[in-house]
């Protein structure tokens, strides 16, 4: 009986330690939601105004322009596209340049 109780307590302790140690990291969407919620609270928005603000904020239409997050591939594509535009490349030359530029990052 004592062994069963001891084993049960041991498993319980291990379980609680594991649950407590697993710090939950927020996803980018959850971070954006928290940020937008704090901004809406600071502006004392209520009702439809808050709902509209939250919707726009989560879509990044009212947040800071640099806050919109791009994937590394999208960033590289934007850089290569800007370089191709600066060099006034068109057609097949542009396609070759873009292909080579995007492969450099990989």
From Swiss-Prot:
<dbReference type="InterPro" id="IPR011690">
    <property type="entry name" value="P_starv_induced_PsiF"/>
</dbReference>
<protein>
    <recommendedName>
        <fullName>Phosphate starvation-inducible protein PsiF</fullName>
    </recommendedName>
</protein>
<feature type="signal peptide">
    <location>
        <begin position="1"/>
        <end position="20"/>
    </location>
</feature>
<keyword id="KW-0732">Signal</keyword>
<feature type="compositionally biased region" description="Polar residues">
    <location>
        <begin position="70"/>
        <end position="89"/>
    </location>
</feature>
<dbReference type="Pfam" id="PF07769">
    <property type="entry name" value="PsiF_repeat"/>
</dbReference>
<feature type="region of interest" description="Disordered">
    <location>
        <begin position="58"/>
        <end position="92"/>
    </location>
</feature>
């Amino acid at each position: 009986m004592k062994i069963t109780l001891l084993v049960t307590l041991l498993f319980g302790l291990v379980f609680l330690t594991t649950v407590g140690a697993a710090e939950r990291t927020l996803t980018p969407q959850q971070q954006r939601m928290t940020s937008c919620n704090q901004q809406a609270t600071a502006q004392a928005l209520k009702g439809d105004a808050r709902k509209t603000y939250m919707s726009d904020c989560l879509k990044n239409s009212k947040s800071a322009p640099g806050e919109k997050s791009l994937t590394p591939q999208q960033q590289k594509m934007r850089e290569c596209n800007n370089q191709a535009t600066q060099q006034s490349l068109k057609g097949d030359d542009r396609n070759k340049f873009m292909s080579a530029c995007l492969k450099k990052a990989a």
